Regions:
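Catalytic machinery of carbohydrate-active enzymes
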Residues: 1-158
């Protein structure tokens, strides 16, 4: 019988988000291995995800090794070391899929992020403010503050 699996994902939000379709495929194709995700850069990208949320653990989770890892096979995918990626044959998400699932280049669904109500309200407020100030109908918003951003109090109308 095969051992269960733990997949380590390191780096920031971009790497975490890029890993989502490959991990979804792994779960779909290896449900019997009951995979968990060890999120070295935080669990934010997996929060609220119907298949991944309950599988995601911070690397500082109490008793992580003893309770969750010691009886599992450990995968540490490194998409930047995948030949197809560094030869520009595939995307970062596909490189994760190759590193995790070893099925070559294949089409993957888009990564979906589940946003909280607070995040949606904050984004609406930010977009409305920028549209009002610029007079433009279409905008692109970059949020360069990472986890350090402090949202203001919001209400449903904003």
């Amino acid at each position: 019988m095969a051992r269960k699996t733990a997949i380590f994902v390191n780096g920031g939000a971009g790497r975490s988000i890029s890993s989502i379709p490959a991990i979804e495929k792994y779960i779909e194709e290896n449900a019997d291995l009951d995979p968990i995700i060890i999120c070295e850069g935080g669990t934010d990208a997996y929060k609220g995800h119907p298949k991944l949320h309950y599988r995601a653990y911070d690397n500082w989770h109490k008793n992580l090794f003893q309770d969750l890892l010691k009886d599992r096979d450990l995968l540490s995918p490194e998409p930047y070391r995948v030949w197809e990626y560094y030869n520009q044959k595939c995307s970062l998400g596909q490189a994760y899929d190759i590193a995790i699932n070893d099925k070559g280049i294949r089409d993957l669904p888009r990564a979906n992020l589940k946003l909280s109500k607070e995040e949606i309200l904050l984004a609406r407020k930010m977009i409305a403010e920028v549209k009002e100030k610029t007079g433009k109908d279409k905008i692109v918003v970059f949020q360069p503050f990472g986890r350090g951003a402090q949202p203001e109090k919001l209400d449903e109308k904003q």
